[in-house]
Amino acid sequence: QGVNYGIESVKRGHKTIMIPGQYTYFDMAQSENERGHRWAAIIDTKRVYRYEPIPINDLTHEQRKLIKGVQGALWSEYLDLPARFMEYQSYPRISALSEIAWSKKEDKNWENFYSRLTNSHLNRLANMGIAFRDFPPTANYNKGKITVTVPYTNAEVRYAVQSSEPTKQSPLYTSPIETKDYEHYKFKTFFGEAAASPSVKAEKPAVANWNSSK
């Protein structure tokens, strides 16, 4: 359910564990083009990290003491395929959930968390054989070239052409690609043997911004 249900529970004097659908339901899709529910929100790792389990403005000091923790939920309707989708939906969103559970609001910093996650913790997940969702690259097409921005330092980004999905055997992206057929390219981040991001296509820059008020 939503954040307000947890707040209402606390205001009625109940000990409460916060589990709002729009932040901690891991059966929600992680982007517009990925498998999963959408009724609560599109929930990526950054959105999980943004959630503050103990609302400062809505509750008194004594009421906040009734919040005993935060929890993630993963319902199974979409977990039948592809293979190991439960791991993909869980990690690294669980890492973000864990950090907000034990961190004070003033200590939270997305850039710091993301750096620690991509520099060390993803490697731990890979060594454990977890098929986590890696962070996708961004690809832009301009002046006859596709330029890819990797999601973090030394990320392994591979690409495929003609509508096929990139695999671990696909060419490694190392420099801008000259082409007229940018719409045929897909790019994906890989980590270890099991983890990968969703694939992305190159986008052209907007020609102009339209303002209907003028």
Where are these regions (language model features)?
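Short, compositionally stereotyped local motifs that mark structural "simplifiers"
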Residues: 104, 108-214
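Flexible, acidic glycine-rich loops studded with aromatic residues
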Residues: 1-145
